[in-house]
Structures are given as structure tokens and as C-alpha cells.
């Protein structure tokens, strides 16, 4: 069994931007046999403006996509600001994320068929649950607070430049305004 915990805190009290931001991440891998592994990733994030200041938009959390809730377009979960160019066209909304996030990923990892003992090419099945939350304002419409969920399968290759992942996804809990993707590709991280 391998596990890791990451805790990060930011505090800004100087200048015109005053805020606190805290992140927590926990990952654990359980070998089920020599060939199969079950993995879990949990993340929580919280940000708040201090001294009457708003939480900075550039520090917002963004959810959706590989590395988050797969099956949703990258960075589309959370608050939206209606486009000033086409205010009635929901497809033109600007995604602004939110100051709170929740994410749970679970994966069953297995060797790719026909590769023998090569552990660099693997396949996985997954279920993801999560969302990004915001505080509504006159310029930001916070999307539904309901958790989003997806499932799917994919392949990963531990290449010389880092992990490459390709996933086929199906959102299983979504809202009408959510932007979804069936196929997603990622370079970089395990989840």
C-alpha cells in the first residue's frame, strides 16, 4: 500500500489582494494482486477573500477534464459569467471556476493485454465525483451545486516524457448546461 498527502496554504495580506487559500490532497494505492491495483485520489480546496476583499478570480479552482472530473470539458465546472458579446448565448459564457472544490477519483488499474510484464502500458476503469463551487454575484452565475459524476475506461503509458493518458468517458450525473467530452487526452499526472 502506497499513499501520499499534500497540504498547501496560501495567505496574502499585502497590497490590494487579501485572501487565504487552502488545499488538501490524499492519494492511496492498494495492490489487489500482482496485476491489479485500486487507486483513490481525494482533493478539497477552499479560498476566501480577507478584510472585505473578494477572493481573486485568478486564484479560483476549475474542475472538469482529465486530472479532475473526467467526461466534462476541461475547466468548465463552476461559476459562469455571461458573455458581454452574446449575453443570451449560453455557449459563449465565460467559465470562471469558484473558490471551493471537491474531487474524488477512483481507478482500477490493470496491465494492458498482450504486453507481458511490461508495466509501462496499462488500462484503467474509473469513477469520478466532484464539482467546483462559487459565491454568486451580479456578474457571476454559480452553476448547480449538485455533484457531477462520470465513469469510463482508458489506457495509460508511462512514456519517457511522463504519463500519457487517453480516456473514454461517460458523464453519469450532469446538468443540462454542462459541457461534456467523450474522449480526453492528458500528459503529465497519474490522476
PLM feature spans:
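C-terminal outer-membrane beta-barrel translocator/porin domains of Gram-negative envelope proteins
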Residues: 1-121, 125-129, 133-136, 142, ...
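Exposed loop/turn and edge beta-strand positions of beta-sandwich/beta-sheet ligand-binding modules
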Residues: 20, 149, 181
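Membrane-spanning beta-strand positions in outer-membrane beta-barrel proteins
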Residues: 37, 163-165
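Short amphipathic alpha-helical surface patches that serve as generic macromolecular interface elements
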Residues: 103, 148-152, 163, 184
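Active-site scaffold segments
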Residues: 124, 152-158, 165-167
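A short alpha/beta connector and helix-capping loop motif
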Residues: 138-155
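Outer-membrane beta-barrel "beta-signal"
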Residues: 155-162, 180-191
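A short, acidic, flexible beta-alpha connecting loop/helix-capping segment that sits on the rim
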Residues: 170-174
